[in-house]
Amino acid sequence: MPELANKLKPVDSEKITINLGFVDLGHIDLLIAEGFYSNRSDFIRTAIRNQLERHGDAVRQSVARRELDLGLRHFSRADLEAVQRRGETLHIQVLGLATIAADVTPDLARATIASLHILGALQATPAIKAALRDRMH
């Protein structure tokens, strides 16, 4: 088995698909043609950032209330082994990207991760995702 198969590729974004009406799409294309945006992705990213900024206070309050880790949170094998030695379990709550190292075994993940609530994306091997499926909210 190639070594690359054992490693997770770092990602900095997640691809999404949306359905738009033809008139809305035409308006976007017109703004691109007029030079307001470089392409459709630029328009959509800008629109999303503007909406997130518009609701920024509510988002910040919700993040604090829910006690979410914001941004990137990585869980290495050493991290989880330390949790296991202490006889503890983790309740992982992340707004952003949570990653679990490729060398973490499904048994170690199940022994140390009691629950996962990810608002954003989880990057882990398919075996880890399958092992934790019943703990994801």
Regions flagged by a language model, labelled:
Residues E53-R86:
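Short, positively charged interaction helices/loops
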Residues V63, D79-H91, A102-A114, A130-M136:
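Short, T/G/N/S-enriched strand-turn elements that build extracellular solenoid repeat scaffolds
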Residues E67, L72, H91, L97, ...:
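Detector for repetitive beta-architecture
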